[in-house]
């Protein structure tokens, strides 16, 4: 077993946020892969709220969804910081960065 210190980047967005004609979470996932970042996962929330305090949740028969989405990316600090520089100005939502230990079995 090997334990390595990495950074976990979390970007909070929503299903309806877009950039360059595609959902913002897809843009982030594609950029992370292109830049060779170690791993990225997209989570769709059941419900949530942000700075507007408007609770967003799934509604039956709703044509457009605006559920919260979280993109998590893990890699070394320098690669994460470069990625953050690249997406600067493209998102005005919450972004968090924390230390994690990745365990390779």
UniProtKB/Swiss-Prot annotation:
Transmembrane stretches, start-end: none
InterPro entries: N-reg_PII-like_a/b, N-reg_PII/ATP_PRibTrfase_C, UPF0166
Database matches in Gene3D superfamilies: 3.30.70.120
Pfam families registered for this protein in UniProt: DUF190
PANTHER family: UPF0166 PROTEIN TM_0021
Family: Belongs to the UPF0166 family.
Protein name per Swiss-Prot or TrEMBL: UPF0166 protein aq_450
Organism: Aquifex aeolicus (strain VF5)
Lineage: Bacteria, Pseudomonadati, Aquificota, Aquificia, Aquificales
